[in-house]
Regions:
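Soluble extracellular-acting proteins and domains
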Residues: 79-189
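Feature marking well-ordered beta-strand scaffolds used for ligand recognition
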Residues: 1-117
C-alpha cells in the first residue's frame, strides 16, 4: 500500500492513499484551524514525517505534534501494525531515500489480506481460510515450533486466487512473498 503524508503551510496534515495512482484518496487529516480568526498569520506545518510508528508534524508556530494512526474504514489495525514493523534503518533523516523492508510476520500478511478484502479482490471464505492458517503460524512461531505441513499450506493457499486489477496484483504478490517468508521461518524455527 502506498500512503503519503502532506503538510500544509496554512493548514494541517493530510494522509493520502495513492496505491491506485489514478484514484488517490485522502484517508485522514489533522488541522488545528487558523492561528487568528481575522488576520492572516503564518501557521500550519512545515513538514510531516513517519518514523517508528508515529507521525511527527513540525508546526510553523505551534511546535511539534506527534500522532498515531487509529484503525478506520480506510486503514486496518493489521496495516498499522505492519507499518510499525517496517525497518527504516537506525538513522532518522527525512531527506534520505532509504529502502524500507518488512519482516516475514503474520501481521504483515494480515495487512496485505486486509487490503485485498477492502478492494473486494478475495472472497470472505478464502480470506478466513488464510486467517486460520496465520493464527496457527502465530502460535507456532511464538513457541519456536516447526511445521512443514503448515509451511506448505501457507505457500499454496493463494495459488487459486486471481485478481482483476494491477493494484490487487501487487497486493497479492506482496502477500505471497510474505507467506513464503513465514513458511521458511516455520521450517527453520
Amino acid at each position: 500500500r502506498d500512503i503519503f503524508l502532506q503538510a500544509w503551510y496554512q493548514g494541517g496534515i493530510s494522509i493520502f492513499d495513492f496505491t491506485d495512482s489514478s484514484n488517490p484518496r485522502e484517508i485522514a487529516f489533522f488541522d488545528r484551524g487558523p492561528i487568528d480568526d481575522e488576520a492572516l498569520v503564518s501557521g500550519g506545518f512545515w513538514s510531516t514525517y513517519w518514523y517508528d510508528g508515529k507521525i511527527y508534524g513540525t508546526g510553523i508556530v505551534r511546535g511539534l505534534d506527534v500522532f498515531e494512526l487509529l484503525p478506520s474504514e480506510h486503514i486496518s489495525e493489521n496495516e498499522i501494525a505492519a507499518a510499525k514493523l517496517a525497518s527504516q534503518g537506525n538513522i532518522f533523516n527525512p531527506q534520505q531515500q532509504l529502502k524500507v523492508s518488512w519482516p516475514a510476520n503474520p501481521v504483515v500478511a494480515s495487512a496485505h489480506l486486509d487490503q485485498l478484502i477492502r478492494s473486494k479482490s478475495v472472497s470472505v471464505e478464502k480470506a478466513q481460510d488464510l486467517r486460520n492458517l496465520l493464527d496457527r503460524a502465530v502460535v507456532l512461531l511464538n513457541q519456536k515450533g516447526k511445521s512443514e505441513e503448515l509451511a506448505e499450506s501457507l505457500r499454496s493457499v493463494t495459488n487459486s486466487w486471481s485478481v482483476k486489477t494491477k493494484v490487487s496484483e501487487g497486493q497479492l504478490s506482496g502477500l505471497r512473498q510474505i507467506l513464503i517468508g513465514i513458511s521458511e521461518r516455520l521450517i527453520a524455527s
